[in-house]
Protein backbone atom coordinates (compact mmCIF):
# COMPACT_ATOMS: atom_id res chain seq x y z
CA UNK A 1 0.00 0.00 0.00
CA UNK A 2 2.65 2.50 1.06
CA UNK A 3 5.20 1.75 -1.65
CA UNK A 4 2.50 1.74 -4.33
CA UNK A 5 1.28 5.19 -3.38
CA UNK A 6 4.88 6.37 -3.10
CA UNK A 7 5.45 5.28 -6.70
CA UNK A 8 2.19 6.97 -7.70
CA UNK A 9 3.38 10.21 -6.10
CA UNK A 10 6.54 10.10 -8.24
CA UNK A 11 4.42 9.52 -11.35
CA UNK A 12 2.10 12.37 -10.39
CA UNK A 13 5.09 14.68 -10.12
CA UNK A 14 6.18 13.67 -13.62
CA UNK A 15 2.69 14.00 -15.10
CA UNK A 16 1.92 17.31 -13.39
CA UNK A 17 5.15 18.80 -14.74
CA UNK A 18 4.64 17.37 -18.23
CA UNK A 19 1.17 18.90 -18.37
CA UNK A 20 2.76 22.35 -18.30
CA UNK A 21 5.02 21.43 -21.24
CA UNK A 22 4.48 20.20 -24.79
CA UNK A 23 6.11 18.20 -27.57
CA UNK A 24 8.28 21.17 -28.49
CA UNK A 25 9.93 21.02 -25.05
CA UNK A 26 10.94 17.35 -25.04
CA UNK A 27 11.94 15.11 -27.92
CA UNK A 28 10.09 12.11 -26.47
CA UNK A 29 7.29 14.00 -24.74
CA UNK A 30 4.55 11.62 -25.89
CA UNK A 31 6.46 8.55 -24.71
CA UNK A 32 7.14 10.15 -21.32
CA UNK A 33 3.50 11.06 -20.82
CA UNK A 34 2.17 7.75 -22.11
CA UNK A 35 4.46 5.70 -19.88
CA UNK A 36 3.67 7.74 -16.78
CA UNK A 37 -0.10 7.66 -17.34
CA UNK A 38 -0.02 3.94 -18.04
CA UNK A 39 2.03 3.10 -14.98
CA UNK A 40 -0.21 5.21 -12.76
CA UNK A 41 -3.23 3.29 -14.05
CA UNK A 42 -1.53 -0.09 -13.61
CA UNK A 43 -0.57 0.58 -9.99
CA UNK A 44 -4.06 1.80 -9.12
CA UNK A 45 -5.50 -1.31 -10.77
CA UNK A 46 -3.23 -3.54 -8.69
CA UNK A 47 -4.26 -1.69 -5.54
CA UNK A 48 -7.90 -2.23 -6.51
CA UNK A 49 -7.29 -5.97 -6.94
CA UNK A 50 -5.41 -6.29 -3.67
CA UNK A 51 -7.46 -4.12 -1.33
CA UNK A 52 -11.01 -3.79 -2.68
CA UNK A 53 -13.89 -6.16 -3.21
CA UNK A 54 -14.63 -7.49 -6.68
CA UNK A 55 -16.91 -5.50 -8.94
CA UNK A 56 -19.53 -8.27 -8.70
CA UNK A 57 -19.61 -8.14 -4.88
CA UNK A 58 -23.01 -7.62 -3.26
CA UNK A 59 -21.40 -5.69 -0.40
CA UNK A 60 -22.45 -2.21 -1.51
CA UNK A 61 -20.76 -0.52 1.45
CA UNK A 62 -17.40 -2.08 0.58
CA UNK A 63 -17.86 -1.35 -3.13
CA UNK A 64 -18.48 2.32 -2.36
CA UNK A 65 -15.11 2.58 -0.59
CA UNK A 66 -12.46 0.92 -2.75
CA UNK A 67 -9.21 2.92 -2.85
CA UNK A 68 -8.14 6.55 -3.39
CA UNK A 69 -7.25 7.33 -7.02
CA UNK A 70 -4.51 9.90 -6.54
CA UNK A 71 -3.63 12.22 -9.43
CA UNK A 72 -2.03 15.22 -7.71
CA UNK A 73 1.45 15.62 -6.26
CA UNK A 74 0.61 17.41 -3.04
CA UNK A 75 -0.25 16.88 0.63
CA UNK A 76 -4.00 16.85 0.06
CA UNK A 77 -5.74 13.69 1.24
CA UNK A 78 -7.56 12.07 -1.67
CA UNK A 79 -10.96 10.60 -0.78
CA UNK A 80 -11.83 7.00 -1.57
CA UNK A 81 -13.55 6.19 -4.85
CA UNK A 82 -15.96 3.35 -5.50
CA UNK A 83 -14.97 0.17 -7.33
CA UNK A 84 -16.88 1.30 -10.43
CA UNK A 85 -15.23 4.74 -10.33
CA UNK A 86 -11.76 3.18 -10.11
CA UNK A 87 -12.46 1.00 -13.14
CA UNK A 88 -13.63 4.05 -15.10
CA UNK A 89 -10.53 6.04 -14.13
CA UNK A 90 -8.12 3.19 -14.89
CA UNK A 91 -9.70 2.57 -18.30
CA UNK A 92 -9.73 6.28 -19.19
CA UNK A 93 -6.10 6.68 -18.20
CA UNK A 94 -4.98 3.59 -20.12
CA UNK A 95 -6.75 4.90 -23.23
CA UNK A 96 -4.92 8.21 -22.86
CA UNK A 97 -1.66 6.28 -22.55
CA UNK A 98 -2.52 4.26 -25.65
CA UNK A 99 -2.94 7.46 -27.67
CA UNK A 100 0.36 8.93 -26.48
CA UNK A 101 2.27 5.70 -27.18
CA UNK A 102 1.24 5.23 -30.82
CA UNK A 103 4.87 5.65 -31.92
CA UNK A 104 5.57 2.16 -30.55
CA UNK A 105 3.97 0.73 -33.69
CA UNK A 106 7.24 1.70 -35.35
CA UNK A 107 9.65 1.53 -32.42
CA UNK A 108 8.89 -2.06 -31.35
CA UNK A 109 10.15 -4.69 -33.80
CA UNK A 110 8.45 -8.05 -34.23
CA UNK A 111 11.77 -9.84 -33.71
CA UNK A 112 13.51 -8.75 -30.52
CA UNK A 113 17.06 -9.94 -29.96
CA UNK A 114 18.36 -7.56 -27.28
CA UNK A 115 21.16 -5.00 -27.40
CA UNK A 116 18.86 -2.16 -28.49
CA UNK A 117 20.31 1.22 -27.64
CA UNK A 118 18.86 4.49 -26.42
CA UNK A 119 15.57 5.41 -24.75
CA UNK A 120 13.55 4.29 -27.76
CA UNK A 121 15.48 1.04 -28.19
CA UNK A 122 14.37 -1.57 -25.67
CA UNK A 123 10.71 -0.61 -25.60
CA UNK A 124 9.81 -4.00 -24.15
CA UNK A 125 11.42 -2.72 -20.92
CA UNK A 126 9.08 0.29 -20.86
CA UNK A 127 5.33 0.55 -20.47
CA UNK A 128 4.51 0.69 -24.18
CA UNK A 129 1.57 0.83 -26.58
CA UNK A 130 0.96 -2.90 -26.45
CA UNK A 131 1.31 -2.89 -22.68
CA UNK A 132 -1.53 -0.36 -22.58
CA UNK A 133 -3.70 -2.48 -24.86
CA UNK A 134 -2.93 -5.73 -23.04
CA UNK A 135 -3.68 -4.13 -19.69
CA UNK A 136 -6.96 -2.76 -21.04
CA UNK A 137 -7.85 -6.31 -22.10
CA UNK A 138 -7.11 -7.56 -18.59
CA UNK A 139 -9.00 -4.72 -16.89
CA UNK A 140 -12.07 -5.19 -19.08
CA UNK A 141 -11.93 -8.96 -18.51
CA UNK A 142 -11.84 -8.54 -14.74
CA UNK A 143 -14.66 -6.00 -14.95
CA UNK A 144 -16.73 -8.54 -16.86
CA UNK A 145 -16.84 -6.62 -20.15
CA UNK A 146 -15.65 -9.49 -22.34
CA UNK A 147 -16.49 -7.81 -25.64
CA UNK A 148 -14.16 -4.89 -24.89
CA UNK A 149 -11.54 -7.27 -23.49
CA UNK A 150 -11.55 -9.14 -26.78
CA UNK A 151 -11.16 -5.93 -28.79
CA UNK A 152 -8.00 -4.90 -26.94
CA UNK A 153 -6.51 -8.39 -26.75
CA UNK A 154 -7.08 -8.66 -30.49
CA UNK A 155 -5.14 -5.44 -31.06
CA UNK A 156 -2.08 -6.99 -29.39
CA UNK A 157 -2.47 -10.31 -31.17
CA UNK A 158 -2.95 -8.72 -34.61
CA UNK A 159 0.17 -6.60 -34.18
CA UNK A 160 2.03 -9.89 -34.88
CA UNK A 161 4.81 -8.77 -32.54
CA UNK A 162 4.31 -11.39 -29.82
CA UNK A 163 4.05 -15.17 -29.96
CA UNK A 164 3.85 -18.09 -27.58
CA UNK A 165 7.12 -19.65 -26.47
CA UNK A 166 8.02 -22.88 -28.22
CA UNK A 167 8.28 -26.14 -26.29
CA UNK A 168 12.04 -26.18 -26.88
CA UNK A 169 12.48 -22.86 -25.06
CA UNK A 170 10.24 -23.59 -22.06
CA UNK A 171 13.20 -24.13 -19.73
CA UNK A 172 14.86 -20.81 -20.55
CA UNK A 173 12.37 -18.38 -22.11
CA UNK A 174 11.84 -16.36 -18.92
CA UNK A 175 14.51 -17.49 -16.46
CA UNK A 176 15.87 -14.26 -14.99
CA UNK A 177 14.88 -12.51 -18.21
CA UNK A 178 11.94 -10.97 -20.00
CA UNK A 179 10.84 -13.29 -22.79
CA UNK A 180 11.79 -12.12 -26.25
CA UNK A 181 8.76 -14.03 -27.54
CA UNK A 182 5.92 -13.61 -25.04
CA UNK A 183 6.67 -10.50 -22.98
CA UNK A 184 4.60 -7.46 -23.91
CA UNK A 185 6.30 -5.28 -21.34
CA UNK A 186 8.63 -5.93 -18.44
CA UNK A 187 11.04 -4.28 -16.04
CA UNK A 188 14.82 -4.51 -16.03
CA UNK A 189 16.05 -6.29 -12.91
CA UNK A 190 19.50 -7.84 -12.59
CA UNK A 191 18.69 -9.38 -9.20
CA UNK A 192 15.85 -11.75 -10.15
CA UNK A 193 17.78 -14.88 -9.14
CA UNK A 194 18.99 -13.59 -5.78
CA UNK A 195 15.62 -12.01 -4.96
CA UNK A 196 13.73 -15.21 -5.75
CA UNK A 197 16.24 -17.38 -3.88
CA UNK A 198 16.10 -15.19 -0.77
CA UNK A 199 12.37 -14.49 -0.68
CA UNK A 200 10.79 -17.66 -2.07
CA UNK A 201 13.21 -20.60 -1.83
CA UNK A 202 15.31 -20.34 1.30
CA UNK A 203 12.43 -19.12 3.47
CA UNK A 204 9.94 -21.78 4.44
CA UNK A 205 6.38 -21.06 3.47
CA UNK A 206 6.58 -18.21 0.96
CA UNK A 207 7.65 -20.22 -2.07
CA UNK A 208 6.55 -23.70 -1.04
CA UNK A 209 4.44 -25.66 -3.49
CA UNK A 210 1.40 -27.65 -2.45
CA UNK A 211 1.98 -31.38 -2.22
CA UNK A 212 -0.38 -32.02 -5.12
CA UNK A 213 0.97 -29.37 -7.50
CA UNK A 214 1.83 -31.99 -10.12
CA UNK A 215 -1.84 -32.84 -10.52
CA UNK A 216 -2.31 -29.53 -12.36
CA UNK A 217 -0.18 -30.82 -15.22
CA UNK A 218 -0.95 -33.77 -17.47
CA UNK A 219 1.73 -36.41 -17.05
CA UNK A 220 1.17 -38.13 -20.36
CA UNK A 221 -1.29 -37.88 -23.20
CA UNK A 222 -2.95 -40.71 -25.12
CA UNK A 223 -0.12 -40.82 -27.67
CA UNK A 224 2.70 -40.70 -25.16
CA UNK A 225 3.05 -36.92 -25.28
CA UNK A 226 3.60 -35.10 -21.99
CA UNK A 227 3.24 -31.68 -20.43
CA UNK A 228 6.64 -30.05 -20.96
CA UNK A 229 5.97 -27.47 -18.24
CA UNK A 230 6.28 -30.03 -15.46
CA UNK A 231 9.79 -31.07 -16.50
CA UNK A 232 11.03 -27.57 -17.25
CA UNK A 233 9.49 -25.29 -14.62
CA UNK A 234 10.14 -27.21 -11.40
CA UNK A 235 13.15 -28.44 -9.48
CA UNK A 236 14.32 -29.49 -6.03
CA UNK A 237 16.11 -27.47 -3.36
CA UNK A 238 17.83 -28.85 -0.27
CA UNK A 239 16.53 -26.75 2.60
CA UNK A 240 18.33 -27.61 5.84
CA UNK A 241 18.74 -31.22 4.77
CA UNK A 242 15.20 -31.62 3.47
CA UNK A 243 14.54 -31.69 -0.29
CA UNK A 244 11.64 -29.44 -1.28
CA UNK A 245 9.97 -28.91 -4.65
CA UNK A 246 10.41 -25.39 -6.01
CA UNK A 247 9.43 -23.34 -9.04
CA UNK A 248 12.47 -22.60 -11.23
CA UNK A 249 10.54 -21.07 -14.14
CA UNK A 250 11.56 -17.54 -13.14
CA UNK A 251 14.85 -17.94 -11.28
CA UNK A 252 16.52 -20.77 -13.19
CA UNK A 253 18.44 -23.76 -11.87
CA UNK A 254 19.15 -23.20 -8.19
CA UNK A 255 22.53 -24.96 -8.46
CA UNK A 256 23.66 -23.07 -11.55
CA UNK A 257 26.44 -20.69 -10.47
CA UNK A 258 26.00 -18.63 -13.64
CA UNK A 259 22.61 -17.62 -12.27
CA UNK A 260 24.41 -15.26 -9.91
CA UNK A 261 25.56 -13.10 -12.80
CA UNK A 262 24.08 -9.59 -12.71
CA UNK A 263 25.71 -8.08 -15.80
CA UNK A 264 23.98 -7.86 -19.16
CA UNK A 265 25.93 -9.47 -21.99
CA UNK A 266 23.43 -9.39 -24.81
CA UNK A 267 20.40 -11.46 -25.72
CA UNK A 268 17.23 -11.43 -23.60
CA UNK A 269 17.18 -8.63 -21.05
CA UNK A 270 17.59 -9.42 -17.37
CA UNK A 271 14.31 -8.65 -15.67
CA UNK A 272 10.74 -9.53 -14.86
CA UNK A 273 7.80 -9.80 -17.24
CA UNK A 274 4.89 -7.60 -16.14
CA UNK A 275 2.45 -8.99 -18.69
CA UNK A 276 2.89 -11.67 -21.36
CA UNK A 277 0.64 -12.53 -24.26
CA UNK A 278 -0.99 -15.54 -22.49
CA UNK A 279 -1.77 -13.33 -19.48
CA UNK A 280 -4.04 -10.78 -21.16
Predicted features by range, described:
Residues 43, 137-139:
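Residue-level signature for tetratricopeptide repeat
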Residues 48-55, 105, 142-145:
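Short coil/turn linking the two alpha-helices of tandem helical-hairpin repeats
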Residues 126-127, 150-277:
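Hydrophobic-face positions in mid-chain alpha helices that act as interaction patches
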Residues 1-51, 77-84, 94, 99-101, ...:
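Conserved, well-structured interaction surfaces
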Residues 19, 23-28, 99-130:
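Acidic interhelical loop/turn segments
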Amino acid sequence: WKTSYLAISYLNNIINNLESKSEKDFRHYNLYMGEALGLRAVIHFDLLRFFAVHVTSTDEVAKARAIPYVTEYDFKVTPYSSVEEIYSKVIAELKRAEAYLSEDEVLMPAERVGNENGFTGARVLHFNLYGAQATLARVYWMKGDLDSARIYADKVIRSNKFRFASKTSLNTFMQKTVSMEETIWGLYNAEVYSDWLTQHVRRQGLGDLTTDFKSIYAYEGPTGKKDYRLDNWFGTYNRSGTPVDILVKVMGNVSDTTSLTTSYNGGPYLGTSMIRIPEM
